[in-house]
UniProtKB/Swiss-Prot annotation:
The presence of a 'disulfide through disulfide knot' structurally defines this protein as a knottin. The cysteine framework is VI/VII (C-C-CC-C-C). The keyword NAD does not apply. Residues 23-42 form a propeptide. This is Omega-conotoxin-like Ac6.5. Its main location: secreted. It comes from the Eukaryota. It comes from Conus achatinus. The keyword Ribosomal protein does not apply.
Length: 78
């Protein structure tokens, strides 16, 4: 019985801490525009179709890398 009460109190305490922390952190993100431009530049920085995409290349393909020829391919269009 004691253990059950201790577990219930611990769960309630942790839940309260989570709610207080989540409510307190709203609107405190710094450098929002810098973060979003970084994501966009990473998303558009890719290898075009027809170029080599083997394991030594640091960029990813805009489409997919053919497993046999190691050449970037565009996704097939329906």
């Amino acid at each position: 019985m004691k253990l059950t009460c201790v577990v219930i109190v611990a769960v309630l305490l942790l839940t309260a801490c989570q709610l207080l922390t989540a409510d307190d952190s709203r609107g405190t993100q710094k450098h929002r525009s810098l973060r979003s431009t970084t994501k966009v530049s990473k998303a558009t920085d890719c290898i075009e179709a027809g170029n080599y995409c083997g394991p030594t290349v640091m960029k990813i393909c805009c489409g997919f890398c053919s497993p046999f020829s190691k050449i970037c391919m565009n996704y097939p269009q329906n």
